[in-house]
Structure formats: structure tokens, C-alpha cells
Design a protein with these regions (language model features):
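Conserved ATP-binding loop and adjacent catalytic segment of the adenylate-forming AMP-binding
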Residues: 1-5, 13-16, 26-34, 159-165
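AMP-binding/adenylate-forming catalytic core of the ANL superfamily
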Residues: 5, 10-11, 16-17, 24, ...
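Short, small/polar residue-rich loop motifs at catalytic or cofactor-binding pockets
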Residues: 35-37, 133
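AMP-binding/adenylate-forming catalytic domain of the ANL superfamily
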Residues: 123-145, 162-170
Length: 170
């Protein structure tokens, strides 16, 4: 209870596989029939499950698992922040570093230092973003889903991190 882990499911209501896609099926459904959703979830004390993020979005910084959603949820409490996405970017020393991409409320201004201090004042030091980027929009697909892998690719270019250790971006 109260620990994040991958949400898996098995039962008569779970698909047997992807149509004519054996590789995708093998990646999603293990030999015991468990569907690996790719979602991070936490079981509450009452026995309910709460989705807390996506495994592929998890940042591993110096061996620490950092859940972007936790930092995003906190940054939404900043009065100047309209929208935020937290991503992992490659880093030679730690493997990955935290980057917060922030859309400010109309008419607001802020600084990287202000955002970092706000996080440092309320969260563990290892959760403070190394990079803060103020943007006007996030890349999205036709269905309106935010494309974090596109954000990672753009960040690598913008920060000139091509030589840092490679991370999976999709």
C-alpha cells in the first residue's frame, strides 16, 4: 500500500493480444497473461488504485526514481503557473536531469531561479529541476495528447545535450 509500481491486470476482460502484432503483444502481455499497462499506480489504504504517472515518463537521476507527475502537481500550486510538463533530459553525470517546461498565466513573468527556489522550499532537493524552460505551448498530437518525447527531443537540441548519455524518447 501507498507504494508506486506498474499497474498490471489479468482476467477474462483483458485482451489476448494486438491483432496481427505478435511483437507488440509480447511486449505488453507476459507469459502468465498479465497485461503491463505502462502506468504507475499506487494502492490506497482503502484498496483503490490511483494512477500516478507513466513508467516511460519516470526520470532516473543518479539512481533515484523521480515521478514527473509529483513535481507537475506541485508546480501547479505556484500562482503564476498555468500549465507545466516535467521531462527527463540526458545528463553525463546523473544519467538524467529534471526539466520543467512551464506555461505562465497571461501577463505573468517568472525566472528559472524563482521556480527552482519554490520547489526547493517545499520538496526534496533531488526533485528540484535543473532546467526550467518557459514556453507558450506544448507539442500535441491530433487527439490533444501532449507529446513528451517531442519535448525531450527539443530540449536536447536547445540545451546542446546530444553528447550526454542517450535516453529513450518514446
Amino acid at each position: 500500500d501507498e507504494v508506486d509500481g506498474e499497474f498490471v491486470a489479468r482476467g477474462y476482460n483483458i485482451m489476448k493480444g494486438y491483432y496481427k502484432m505478435p511483437e507488440a503483444t509480447a511486449a505488453a502481455i507476459d507469459e502468465n497473461g498479465w497485461l503491463h499497462t505502462g502506468d504507475l499506480a499506487r494502492r490506497t489504504k482503502k484498496g483503490y488504485y490511483k494512477i500516478t504517472g507513466r513508467i516511460k515518463d519516470m526520470i532516473i537521476r543518479g539512481g533515484e526514481n523521480i515521478y514527473p507527475k509529483e513535481i507537475e502537481d506541485f508546480l501547479y500550486t505556484h500562482p503564476k503557473v498555468k500549465d507545466v510538463q516535467v521531462i527527463g533530459v540526458p545528463d553525463k553525470q546523473y544519467g538524467e536531469e529534471i526539466m520543467a517546461c512551464i506555461i505562465l498565466n497571461d501577463g505573468e513573468t517568472s525566472s528559472e531561479e524563482e521556480i527552482k527556489q519554490y520547489v526547493l522550499d517545499h520538496m526534496a532537493k533531488h526533485k528540484v529541476p535543473r532546467y526550467v524552460d518557459f514556453v507558450t505551448e506544448f507539442p500535441m498530437n491530433a487527439a490533444g495528447k501532449i507529446l513528451k518525447y517531442k519535448m525531450r527531443e527539443a530540449a536536447v537540441e536547445k540545451l546542446n545535450l546530444q553528447q550526454a548519455s542517450k535516453i529513450v524518447t518514446a
